[in-house]
């Protein structure tokens, strides 16, 4: 079957990486697992041998022959023919996620996962995206994505995966990442406002926090002059001269709360 470029289909063929993903997810016979993208079923079959239940969300119904083969062999596999971004994940009751993600939906699907309860997710991403997810302050990988994902999950970069592990071979390297869901390590008063502050700051990651916020005041929906007044009012409580890329997530959370109290 010819894979769909539109759907970003690159099927994971290398069984070593399939096994690595499953091992790092620590799947047991008590786990209910969510997988995105059936492919030819290489990952699904291995999951089904161990897990209590496997839900697979797949959009491409041309893959039905593979689905029929798997569901006839494994009674614990259920295929959901739909767009993963539109499925209500809260009703599925899974506790783990293992998936080779379509790279064009990496960001929205990751944040959709983080909005629901799960224990562990072991996911395949484009290499550069994975590095940014795991980015730490004062590194070139540190980004808005780093702070947003690490707000309520621990991120572990497991390994780099070469194009040769897939069919067809993608043009980029990939990586396996493990997300462990947890409660936030710091408090923010309003998560939506926190995300707006993040966006405003990281549009200018090399500038000082003050300059970045003023230049992107529209992102936090505060008039530029009003924002200048607010920053002057709270400058005794925060160091606005620090560069954005050096600022820890905890400090950004604290700043978000300071600004939120003033609007």
Curated annotation (Swiss-Prot):
Catalytic activity, EC: 2.1.1.-
GO CC field: cytoplasm
GO MF, one annotated term: RNA binding
Residues the entry annotates as binding S-adenosyl-L-methionine: 12, 37, 58, 83, 100
Main location: cytoplasm
Alphabetic keyword roster: Cytoplasm, Methyltransferase, RNA-binding, rRNA processing, S-adenosyl-L-methionine, Transferase
CDD domains in UniProt: AdoMet_MTases
The UniProt record lists the keyword Transferase: yes
InterPro entries noted in UniProt: KsgA/Erm, rRNA_Ade_diMease-like_C, rRNA_Ade_Mease_Trfase_CS, rRNA_Ade_methylase_Trfase_N, rRNA_adenine_dimethylase, SAM-dependent_MTases_sf
Cross-referenced Gene3D superfamilies: Ribosomal RNA adenine dimethylase-like, domain 2, Vaccinia Virus protein VP39
Localization per record: Cytoplasm
Protein family per UniProt: Belongs to the class I-like SAM-binding methyltransferase superfamily. rRNA adenine N(6)-methyltransferase family. RsmA subfamily.
UniProt-listed PANTHER family: DIMETHYLADENOSINE TRANSFERASE (PTHR11727), DIMETHYLADENOSINE TRANSFERASE-RELATED (PTHR11727:SF7)
General function of this protein: Specifically dimethylates two adjacent adenosines in the loop of a conserved hairpin near the 3'-end of 16S rRNA in the 30S particle. May play a critical role in biogenesis of 30S subunits.
NCBIfam families hit by this protein: ksgA (TIGR00755)
Protein name: Probable ribosomal RNA small subunit methyltransferase A
Lineage: Archaea, Methanobacteriati, Methanobacteriota, Methanomada group, Methanococci
């Amino acid at each position: 079957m010819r894979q769909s470029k539109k759907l970003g289909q690159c099927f994971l063929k290398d069984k070593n990486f399939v096994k690595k993903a499953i091992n790092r997810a620590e799947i047991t016979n008590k786990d209910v697992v969510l997988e995105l993208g059936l492919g030819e079923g290489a990952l699904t079959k291995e999951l089904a041998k161990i897990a209590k239940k496997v839900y697979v969300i797949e959009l491409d119904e041309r893959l039905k022959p593979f689905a029929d083969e798997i569901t006839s062999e494994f009674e614990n596999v259920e295929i959901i023919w739909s767009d993963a971004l539109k499925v209500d994940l809260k009703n599925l009751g899974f506790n783990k996620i293992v998936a080779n993600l379509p790279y064009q939906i990496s960001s929205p699907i990751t944040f959709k996962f983080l909005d629901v309860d799960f224990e562990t997710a072991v996911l395949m991403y484009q290499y550069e995206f994975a590095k940014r997810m795991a980015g730490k302050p004062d590194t070139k990988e540190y980004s808005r994505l780093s702070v947003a994902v690490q707000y309520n999950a621990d991120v572990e970069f497991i390994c780099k995966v070469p194009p040769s592990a897939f069919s067809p071979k993608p043009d980029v390297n990939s990586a396996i990442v493990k997300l462990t869901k947890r409660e936030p390590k710091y408090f923010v008063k309003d998560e939506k406002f926190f995300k707006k502050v993040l966006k405003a700051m990281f549009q200018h990651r090399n500038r000082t926090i003050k300059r970045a916020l003023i230049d992107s005041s529209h992102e936090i929906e505060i008039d530029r002059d009003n924002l200048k007044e607010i920053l002057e009012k709270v400058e005794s409580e925060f160091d606005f001269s620090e560069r954005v890329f050096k600022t820890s997530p905890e400090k950004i959370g604290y700043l978000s709360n300071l600004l939120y109290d003033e609007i």
